[in-house]
Amino acid sequence: MLLLAGLGLAGMSAARAASLDPAMLPKIQAATFEVVQAKPAGDPLSYERPLPLEQLPYQERTDKYYSIGTAFAIGHNRYVTAGHVLLAGADSLWGPPELRDAAGRVYPIGKIEKFSLGKDFVVFTLAQPPAGDAALAIETSPALNQVVYAVGNALGTGVVIRDGLYTSDTPEQENGAWKWMRFSAAASPGNSGGPLLDKDGKLIGVVLMKSANENLNYA
């Protein structure tokens, strides 16, 4: 896919729905992270009356971090997320964007290596990557109509995997400079920046945006 080529990485035939091999799941989980920002220690604003914080979900009101997206490892201390996920954290009252693994360990971002506003991706390093530096294998020639899996931090509730089909390629709207991948696996707020995997657990794209009117999403 053009998107994977644009990342500088090494982009499915018709298939019926199939589950990922359970043996792949620990590796996928180890290579997938939440993008988080630390909540401020104190609220700089004052309010006329106490806020009804008890109406927020328990996880949201007790977590010390805001969960804003998903990222994943591609090896050699290189990580990928959607460009708009990191941009959302710029000039924020919250802490800088960081990665959090399934065990709750948080890793500060080191250096931005590549960034594309148009294609909406960023490649970066971590200041101190996790031990083992787990990475997803890459498939650069996916075929249409195969089962795919959207991996992400859906709704900020932790990393989940949802299946669908890689349905079509859609030209970029302004001048068709590249093609977006469209897929039917469910995508929710927080999925942005997560990996789109084929049936073998290999990376074929980056989940970027949800279609407003139908369950055909973009990578």
Question: Which role does the model predict for each range below?
Answer:
Residues M1-A10:
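Bacterial N-terminal signal peptides
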Residues M12-A17:
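Sec/Tat signal peptide C-region and signal peptidase I cleavage site
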Residues S19-A23, L45-E48, P52-A82, Y107-P108, ...:
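A conserved glycine-rich beta-strand in the N-terminal activation segment of trypsin-fold
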Residues L20-A23, A88-G89, D133-K179, A187-N191, ...:
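Flexible, gly/ser-rich surface segments that form the specificity/activation loops bordering the active-site cleft
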Residues Y65-I68, I74-K119, P129, L144:
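Catalytic-histidine neighborhood of serine endopeptidases
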Residues F72, A186-V207:
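Catalytic nucleophile loop of clan PA
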Residues K119-L126, Q173-R182:
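Short, solvent-exposed secondary-structure boundary/capping segments
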